[in-house]
């Protein structure tokens, strides 16, 4: 008799915990690793991110189609294994070329997970309020990130390559465990009449395109995601350089100064957990009507805090603005995802979510080199200011999404 698999919601929370732990462990000091071990300059740092986002952009929709046509569970498993291989490659071979190649590998892995995971849990737990599911998953992921940050920072004090390599090995082991326990009981292919791989891809893509065109709220939300992509790569790639070049890191006891980057990530995770709890309580009390205000406030907060982060030079002020910018971005994402989920048909969830991820990547592909060149030719603070301004159009798109969603519901 085969052993009964755990409930999907429990596996989803386990996934968010374990994967966040491993991802944080691998990436908490990755910028420092790229700067101090691989020896990258500001433009190369941004190019690493651009290659990663290009891989995500190229593979995002095809992998979403795979998830909707074949299996969302299988798509998630492939993604976890690719992450493991990518981390091993990046940590083992500290050269610019292999770091770029590693971004392609684990960037492709990310596209297999993005969209498929959200579509899988939304189908398996049909009827549950997805705002709470996604926020609770994000909250647990933030808690796991704390452990990952601690482990990654301690291991990085020994050797900056060690946490990346170990995370890669553990990703492979987690993939094996996940293959045994992850259920998939409510999946039905988006296309019943199959005509071959290429024709199926084309048919589902056209079907999704017609669906999105007929849903103005989805168009607005997808454009908001695109603006978020434009405004994220510069923050991700230049904030570490800003701390190292434009301020003095205080001593951190017996540990070296790079420990501050682990501590910043730790603080960000704690704040993310607390903010998610506040949002869950607000959504339970006020319902989905509060989404518009949440997305508007967090978007405006990100713009203001990032500009203040860019112009500051005192460490404690920079730390406060850095944490605020990261916090607003963290709590904004799951609310937008749940908002989008309410307007997507079940059979097309993974592909629409993947399109959302692709637009995020496309935004980063465009925004990354722009802010990288500004940082290289003028200064890093000006690159960060440029990053913040790229999110401004989303402030005009949020009311459009709210109005369109209201009309569609009526």
Regions found by a protein language model. Give the residues of each.
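Juxtamembrane intracellular "pre-TM" segments in multi-pass secondary transporters
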Residues: 1-6, 181-222
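Helix-loop boundary and gating motifs at the non-cytosolic
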Residues: 2-57, 217-265
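Transmembrane alpha-helix termini and helix-breaking/packing motifs in multi-pass membrane transporters
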Residues: 32, 36, 146-167, 241-252, ...
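Conserved MFS/SLC helix-loop-helix module at the cytosolic interface between two early adjacent transmembrane helices
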Residues: 56-94
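Primarily marks hydrophobic transmembrane alpha-helices of the MFS/SLC 12-helix fold
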Residues: 76, 292-295
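C-terminal ends and interior cores of transmembrane alpha-helices
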Residues: 81-95, 300-313
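Helix-loop junctions on the cytosolic side of multi-pass membrane transporters
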Residues: 167, 172-194, 399-410
